[in-house]
Regions:
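Short, ordered loop/turn segments at secondary-structure junctions
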Residues: 43-44, 66-69, 128-131
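Short, hinge-like loop/turn segments at secondary-structure boundaries
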Residues: 56-59, 78-82, 120, 141-144
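Glycine-rich oxoanion-binding loops at beta->alpha junctions
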Residues: 64-100
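A short, charged, Gly/Pro-tolerant segment at domain boundaries
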Residues: 167-173
Length: 173
């Protein structure tokens, strides 16, 4: 990783509970305090809460939208990127990040975690999906965090240690 800005993609459910929304907002604030750029899907739920937190701490936010209208972005997005490709944009959210933080999550979040793991992009999980291999062993690829501060600190560490993006962006099965 170079001295350039670190981009942290945050993924999570679009209908977040108050508990998950609070965690997401704290994650956003920690991302801004760390000097990283927040990348998300730009809509509601975890995406909006994280963006709100980042903006409250003076951060920069990028929202990669599934539709074709900038107006659909939540009010805390600085740079709405319209795609018109629906939820296929989940790949773009993940690939834009040097690291992914999953906060809570539903099935869309599950797809984003899977894309990140396939692209060898580090994933930090905060109250999100857990994976068990067919042999019954717990998967160790998703790094677990117990707080927003720990999640962002771990994400920053993993991003700095990660291989350059050009070496990790081909999907591996």
């Amino acid at each position: 990783m170079t001295d350039k800005k670190i981009f942290i993609a945050v993924v999570g459910e679009s209908h977040a509970s108050p508990e998950i929304a609070k965690l997401a907002e704290e994650v956003g604030a920690e991302i801004a305090k760390a000097g990283a750029v927040l990348v998300c899907g730009g809509l509601k739920g975890v995406m909006e809460a994280t963006s709100k937190g980042a903006k409250s701490a003076g951060g920069t936010t990028i929202g990669i939208l599934p539709g074709s209208r900038r107006e659909d972005a939540n009010p805390y997005i600085d740079f709405p990127i319209i795609t018109g490709i629906g939820y296929a944009r989940n790949k773009l959210v993940v690939k834009t990040g040097h690291v992914v933080i999953a906060v809570g999550g539903s099935h869309g979040t599950l797809s984003e975690i899977a894309f990140a793991l396939g692209y060898k992009i580090p994933v930090v999980g905060l109250k999100t999906w857990q994976f068990i291999h067919h042999n019954g062993q717990m998967d160790q690829e998703v790094h677990r965090a117990s707080s927003p501060k720990e999640a962002v600190a771990l994400a920053m560490k993993l991003a700095r240690e990660a291989k350059p993006p050009e070496e990790t962006r081909e999907y591996k099965t």
